[in-house]
């Protein structure tokens, strides 16, 4: 039962990530003007990262409870750490670079965040197969 819950929660994180990446973000930038799109993205991303981080931490706790400390544990640990790094280190830098019109640094740091997001989705898919 608890193991099944961890599978559902892992699936939920992947679903949230896919929905956010392929529905929310594109719709925001094609619907809102640039200023409002920026404001919206800056408000929603912390929730996106923290909700996913919270769910992953619950999965980690279930793995610990089940003494499931193999590759799956380390994958979800890596995913969790990447959510924390993205939210608490990378996002403030991305916002700073955008605000200061440092386009090269903004594009590079944004690219890193996209790569991290993609890696997390791959890790989640590996957990589910």
Q: Residue ranges of each PLM-predicted region?
A:
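Polytopic transmembrane helical bundles with strong interfacial aromatic enrichment
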Residues: 1-129
